[in-house]
């Protein structure tokens, strides 16, 4: 569930006037980045992402594993090797049985990679974390945008299958 929905009473809402947490992809308010610095934002994001993986809420897919890359072209690119954090995320997703969404949103928003970035997707592949695909479409014209290229990208990162959800709640693994 999203912040503020049933079962998530303890989840901080970043969009309230009294919130001190902010949000990492709000381009109207960069105080989180300015206060914590790039490394601090990354570390907090990875910790929170792993806590979400470990949640007892009923969901299967973790999306935007490296949304933290959103402002990399605006002066907030990591000045450190993120691989240890990526490995932590891959281990957490694997150990909790979560799938990861490969999203076409990043290239659509002008970034040079996908969500997750190539290095992180390779870590997920190495850890045998299942994947599914999405486009994070907020408009009809973006549904399945660049999806074939995203599938080829996943193949290049080591994946040979991806999972498709069914209305029954079951998942089907299919070849790339």
Residue ranges and their predicted role:
Residues 5-11, 20-21, 75-176:
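Charged catalytic cores and adjacent phosphate/nucleic-acid-binding surfaces used
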């Amino acid at each position: 569930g999203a912040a503020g929905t049933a079962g998530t009473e303890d989840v901080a809402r970043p969009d309230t006037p009294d919130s001190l947490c902010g949000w990492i992809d709000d381009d109207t308010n960069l105080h989180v980045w300015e206060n914590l610095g790039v490394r601090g934002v990354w570390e907090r994001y990875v910790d929170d992402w792993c806590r979400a993986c470990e949640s007892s809420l009923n969901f299967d897919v973790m999306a935007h594993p490296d949304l933290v890359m959103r402002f990399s072209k605006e002066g907030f690119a990591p000045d450190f090797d993120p691989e240890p954090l990526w490995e932590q995320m891959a281990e957490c997703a694997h150990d909790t049985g979560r799938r990861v969404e490969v999203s076409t949103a990043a290239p659509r928003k002008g970034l040079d990679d996908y969500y997750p970035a190539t290095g992180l997707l390779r870590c997920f592949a190495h850890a045998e974390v299942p994947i599914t695909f999405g486009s994070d479409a907020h408009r009809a014209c973006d549904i399945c945008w660049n999806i074939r290229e995203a599938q080829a990208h996943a193949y290049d990162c080591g994946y040979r299958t991806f999972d498709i959800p069914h209305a029954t709640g079951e998942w089907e693994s299919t070849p790339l």
